[in-house]
């Protein structure tokens, strides 16, 4: 990965277009009411998406390394937002549930994957020192494998 960049251009009010590399669709972000109109994800949702996507991709990569196929993956991220001691809103935590599309018994190297994949998630490992991230990994039967 080189040095990724994004250019934000204000459309109106709290709406910002996120322009990535050529060929990547523009993403519209917006604040929810009463500030914005809620036409796109807000910055907290984008942070949650980045953490969830990175963990999902990291788990997928680790499984592929061992020729395991956990698909289809489904990841839910819930952000906790509250006020700090100065009364400012802050993301106080991110709770991630990563659901495998298969039972653990069908994934021959799942324990090795679970022991290592988190360490390779660039976004989560960068965010976690400031925002606590809790992670659970569940198989398709709902059994908790991690967390």
Kindly give the residue locations of the regions a language model identified.
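Extended beta-strand/beta-hairpin segments
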Residues: 1-49, 57-147
């Amino acid at each position: 990965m080189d040095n990724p960049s994004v250019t934000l251009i204000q459309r109106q009010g709290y709406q910002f277009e996120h322009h990535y590399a050529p060929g990547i669709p523009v993403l519209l972000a917006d604040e929810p009411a009463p500030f914005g109109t809620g036409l796109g994800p807000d910055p907290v949702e984008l942070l949650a998406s980045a953490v969830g996507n990175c963990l999902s991709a990291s788990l997928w990569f680790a499984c592929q390394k061992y020729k395991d196929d956990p698909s289809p993956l489904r990841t839910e991220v819930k952000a906790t937002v509250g006020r700090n001691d100065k009364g400012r809103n802050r993301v106080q935590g991110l709770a991630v549930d990563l659901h495998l599309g298969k039972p653990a018994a069908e994934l021959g190297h799942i324990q090795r994957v679970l022991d290592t994949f988190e360490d390779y998630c660039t976004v989560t490992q960068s965010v976690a020192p400031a925002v606590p991230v809790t992670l659970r990994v569940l198989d398709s039967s709902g059994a908790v494998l991690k967390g």
